[in-house]
Every structure is written in C-alpha cells, then in structure tokens.
Curated annotation (Swiss-Prot):
A GO cellular component entry from the record: cytoplasm
Important for tRNA non-discrimination, annotated site positions: 75, 125
Keywords: Aminoacyl-tRNA synthetase, ATP-binding, Cytoplasm, Ligase, Nucleotide-binding, Protein biosynthesis
UniProt binding sites for L-aspartate: 216, 262, 489, 534
The protein's name in its UniProt record: Aspartate--tRNA(Asp/Asn) ligase
Protein location: Cytoplasm
Length: 642
C-alpha cells in the first residue's frame, strides 16, 4: 500500500497514534516495531559527519548524516531537504522514485532523518553563500525517517517569535543556529578556562551545594532537612567561605565553575541560579591576581574572538563615579559628567543653592546634536531622570548658530547660561542636561541619561570591547534604611593596610574613608568579574563583624566555624569570580543572559517549559516539617481560581 498524504498520513497530527509507516509505505501496528527497525539502521550506519561540517574537501566522499528536517522543497522528480543539526545545515537531494529514498515524499519539518549519501560540489550559480556548507550538497543513496514530529508551534529559524513561547518550547528553540552557537561558545570558554588555570597550577575543587546559610546581601534559597527537623541548608550564593577554607587547607591555587543561587529580583542580565568562574590564590597581592586574570582574558578573547587585547587601563572607583556616574562605566563613548559647582555657587538660583548647602552636587552632561530636541523629548529625559531618583532636570539647548534657550533662562544671565553650557562640554547644536541632588542620586540620574543617549544617538560602537579595572572601592557604605554601616562587597574583603588599625580600633570617624583591596573587571558597562584580597587575621575579621552590627552570638552562629579556622595559620590570600553567563553573553554579542543559558528562568524566576516552581503535596511538606503560611495558602487558592 503506497504511503500518500491524506487521512492515513495524518499520524503526526495524532489521528492515528497507533499506526506508523515504514519507508516502503507498509502500515505497522505498533511503534515498537518501527523503533526496532530505526535502531537497526542507526546501529548499522554510524554518523560520520555533522551537517554543518561539510565542505568541498569532502566532495566525492560517502557520508552518513543524522538530524532534523529544517525545510523540504518538492520539485517533483527530486526532493530537496535542508538537514539541520547542532553544527549547521546542509542541502540533501533525494529521488522520491527510488525505493531507498521513497520516504522523502513524507518528510515534514522537524522530522528526524538519517541519510547516507555522497557529497557533491554544487555547480556554479547553484551555490548558497548564506550557509557555510553552501558550496556542496549531499546526493542521498538511502534515507530513514527515525521519528516524526508534531507540527511545531513556531519555525526554529524564525527570529521574531515571542520570547515566552520560545521559553515554553525551549527544546525547540535550542535547535536554532543562534542558541546552538551560544552554547558551543559557552563550552569552548569552559574548556579554555579549565586548560588555562590548570596550566597555571590551579586545582579544580568542587564545593558543596547544600551548605550553611551565610547571607551575602541577597536572600538565600533554603532547603529543609528531613533527617534534622527544623534545620535548613542554604544553596550557596557563592563559595566564598569554602574557597577561603581551601586556602587555609593548603590548596593555594583553586578554581571551579561554580553554581550559585540568589533569591533576588531579576534583570535582563540576572538569573536566580548562575555560574561563576571562581578562583582563589594564596601568597599573593592584588597585582598578582589582576595580572593572572588579564592573561586569562587575553587568552579567551584571542581564541574565541580572534582579538588581541592590549593592556587594560585602571580607574579608581571615585574617578569612575565622578566621570561616568557608575562604578562599571561603558567607556566605548564619551559624554562624561562635568562638575558645575564652581560656576553655580552663589548664583542665587534657589534649587542649586539649597542642594549645595546640604552638601550635594550640581553636575551635567552634553547630549550631542540635542539642540533639536522637542519639548516632548526633553520631558521624556526629565521623566527618566526622575525615575532614577532625581528631583528634576535642567536643560540648556543650543541652536546651530549658538543661540541658547533653557528651562531656567529667567534665573540666569545669558553669560552664565553659556558658561554652564560650555562647562558641560556642550558645543553648537548640543543640549546640556544638569542635575542637582545628593551625590549618589545625581550620579545615578546622569549615568542613566548618559547610557540612554549612547544608545539613542548611536554613539556606541558595538563591535568594540572596552575593558577596565576599577579599583580602590570604599570598604563600607552607610545604609540609611538600616541606619548602620554595611560591607560594600562582602565582610571578608580586606581594608587597605592604612585602614586596618582603624577597623580594629572601631574608629567610626574613619569608616566613610576606608578603602578596600577590591577590584572589578568591567567590559562595555558590565561588571564581568569582581574580587578582593581577603581578611586573613582572626582579630580583623572579628572587628569587621562587630562593625557590621553583628553580636557575638550571631557571629558565632553564622561564622564561628570560619573564625575558628582563621586561628590555624591562614596565609595571605585573595581571589576573584567572573560571571560565566555574563562573559559568554558579551562574547556572543547579545544583551540577555537567557540567550546563553540552556534552560533559563523568566524575569519572575519561573521555568515556563517545566512549569516550575510548582506546588507540592502536603505529605512532602510534612516530611520535611514545613507548613505553608496563610499568605501562601491564599496565593495558591487565588491561582486555582484564575
């Protein structure tokens, strides 16, 4: 009985689920028979090449390919198939009138196909420069449909599919050339890192996933213990104390690609679980770690991107904040922040005078060609500054002939406006944007505006990678909400030597001036890695915990094991952690971490594919001694009603 399209063929739509067909069109009563025959084919003929690996050097060779049907084109006497696997696509030519390739009549998108054939060079005029295998095609000798596919919810090659749909069917999206390339790059980076660090004397050591709750700023993911009722593990936010314990243990060069977990609000470049390239070294100083990591960076960029990275410049935290308003500046473009204090002091403009009297700042930037901004565009920029925390935004526009207009024209003379405009870096045809507020708020607002202008005005060269070390971070920062000093990085970061005694002596007057032996590696406005020299003396670590407001009881409960370890000959040590996901994101030139993770979460920390997190039954909760709160019960009830 010939196999033809029609009612019988629609098994792939679920109408004849118990019927399948062999290549000769025979109806088989069970899928088990088909599976056995398919596996016999796979056992007899092993794949010899990936689809995307073929080129003219293989012309004339017999090959066996296995993959998915990307596109099928029926030309009557011949059927053309674009066969896809993780390495790419190749065109396969089949004759549907031959028994060995008769099944080509029945192929549809995403069917799994095995092909034995001969590689042929395409004739001139028939080559496809859009794909890397475009100079060749495979002339099929025989083929086998290894499995059928339901009609997919979207074409794998379609780049305009709603992201939520792609995440729900992530296994289909992962077949795309885009995501295949990203995951292959990720693998290459992991292999490079392991090879480089191993060659430089590092040992890869795995640390526990079930560990003690030692909060590092974000909330912990907690895991109840069944065998120890009322007790909890925490999924580690980082292996911080563990890698320091390895230094105490004598493993003086450690690394791992560590899984980390943080229960925090998400952004485009954040996930609740993530990977970091974690390393620690003993008997070193800050320069040693920075030098080692520059070498690693150069190795990665040379081998993955073919780019030679030169010397990486350095900038202090204070300079980064003053010039760019942020501690991870994108230095691919200018539009730097300028200080207007000397110009506007005593100007009589109450807004500026009041801010300066409170110890605030008045600073501005110049938007290139912003002199043509409409009132609506300026209102949009003002709203943007307000969302960043600023009270408002002053603008000064210049026409092409240099004529100025401003939102504060009635408060300043034309000469003073011109002076302010020029101080912001403005030229004819530009627009100066000025913020007056406390230091942190003004920096945040101007940084937000600067990055917006960089993107909107196409000031950023996306083909460039601009690296930067940011150093000399504050050790501490004051939290108005908590009314106490908190660690800028984490409580294990060492102060610079000149501040160590102030820390031990609880010299509160020096807290705001203390600098840390900390360093961040920045690329294109992203913090790619961050680290520090660690506190390695017990009395300094205890002083840090006291400064942070931790009682002796709390310190012992959370970190008693670590303080005890510091008593037993701890060497000077330090380290760094790179965000693996962010690193690959930059290398793949995408702006979303979800694009470089196989199975990512959404911005609400959910997995649409597996529908998790999900409700568990009450027996499971009872086993681990957990009972849902009234709020959680109400949430579940509301979900069931919706």
């Amino acid at each position: 009985m010939p196999l033809v399209e029609g009612p019988l063929y629609r098994f792939c739509y679920g109408e004849y689920k118990n019927m399948v067909f062999d290549c000769n069109g025979t109806i088989c009563k069970s899928g088990a028979h088909e599976q056995g025959r398919h596996m016999k084919f796979v056992k007899e003929l092993k794949r010899t090449h990936y689809c995307g690996s073929l080129g003219v050097s293989q012309a004339g060779q017999k090959v066996v390919l296995m993959g998915w049907v990307d596109v099928r084109r029926d030309h009557g006497s011949l059927v053309f198939i674009d066969l896809r696997d993780r390495e790419g696509i190749v065109q396969v030519v089949l004759d549907p009138n031959k028994a060995e390739t008769a099944s080509s009549k029945n192929l549809r998108g995403e069917f799994v196909l095995a092909v034995e054939g001969v590689v042929r060079a395409r004739p001139d005029g028939m080559k496809n420069a859009k794909i890397k295998t475009g100079e060749v095609e495979v002339e099929a000798i025989r083929c086998e449909i290894l499995n059928e596919s339901a009609v997919p919810p979207f074409q794998v090659s379609d780049t305009n599919v709603n992201e939520m749909l792609r995440l729900k069917y992530r296994y289909l999206d992962l077949r795309s050339a885009r995501l295949s390339s990203h995951l292959i790059t990720r693998h290459k980076v992991a292999q490079l890192v392991r090879r480089f660090l191993s060659d430089n004397g590092f040992l890869e050591v795995e640390t526990p996933i079930l560990y003690k709750s030692t909060p590092e700023g974000a909330r912990d993911y907690l895991v109840p213990s069944r065998v120890n009722p009322g007790h909890f593990y925490a999924l580690p936010q980082s292996p911080q104390t563990l890698k320091q314990l390895l230094m105490i243990s004598g493993y003086d060069r450690y690394f791992q690609i560590a899984r980390c977990f943080r229960d925090e609000d998400l952004r485009a470049d954040r996930q609740p679980e993530f990977s970091q390239i974690d390393m620690e070294m003993s008997y070193i100083d800050q320069e040693d770690i920075m030098e080692m990591n520059e070498k690693l960076l150069r190795t990665i960029w040379k081998e993955i991107k073919g780019i030679d990275v030169g010397a990486i410049p350095r900038m202090t935290y204070q300079e980064a904040m003053d010039r760019y308003g942020i501690d991870k500046p994108d230095t691919r473009f200018g539009v730097e922040i300028k200080d207007l204090k000397s110009i506007v002091t005593g100007s009589g403009f109450k807004v500026f005078d009041d801010v300066l009297a409170r110890g605030g700042i008045v600073r501005g930037i110049a938007a290139p060609k912003g002199g043509s901004y409409s009132r609506g565009q300026l209102d949009k920029l003002t709203d943007m500054a307000k969302r960043a925390g600023a009270k408002g935004l002053v603008w000064i526009k210049s026409e092409a002939d240099g004529t100025l207009s401003s939102s504060v024209s009635k408060f300043f003379s034309p000469e003073k406006l011109a002076e302010m405009f020029k101080a912001c870096g403005g030229e004819a045809g530009d627009c100066a944007l000025v913020v007056a507020d406390d230091y942190d708020t003004a920096c945040a607002a101007l940084s937000t505006l600067r990055l917006h202008l960089g993107r909107e005005l196409n000031l950023i060269d996306n083909s460039k990678y601009k690296f930067l070390w940011v150093v000399d971070f504050p050790l501490l920062e004051y939290s108005p909400d908590e009314k106490r000093w908190v660690a800028r990085h984490h409580p294990f970061t060492s102060p610079k030597d000149e501040f160590a005694q102030d820390l031990v002596n609880n010299n509160e007057a020096a807290y705001g001036k203390m600098l840390a032996k900390a360093y961040d590696l920045v690329c294109n406005g992203y913090e790619m890695g961050g680290g520090s020299i660690r506190i390695y003396r017990n009395e300094i670590q205890q002083a840090m915990f006291r400064l942070l407001g931790m009682s002796e009881e709390e310190t012992q409960h959370k970190f008693g094991f670590f303080l005890e370890a510091l008593k037993y000959g701890t060497p000077p040590h330090g380290g760094i952690a790179w965000g693996m996901d962010r690193l690959v994101m930059l290398l793949c030139e995408t702006d979303a971490i979800r694009e470089v993770i196989a199975f990512p979460k959404t911005a609400k920390a959910t997995d649409l594919m597996s529908d998790c997190p999900s409700e568990v039954n009450r027996d499971q909760l009872a086993e681990v001694g957990v009972r849902l709160s009234t709020l959680a019960e109400k949430h579940l009830e509301d979900l069931k009603k919706s």
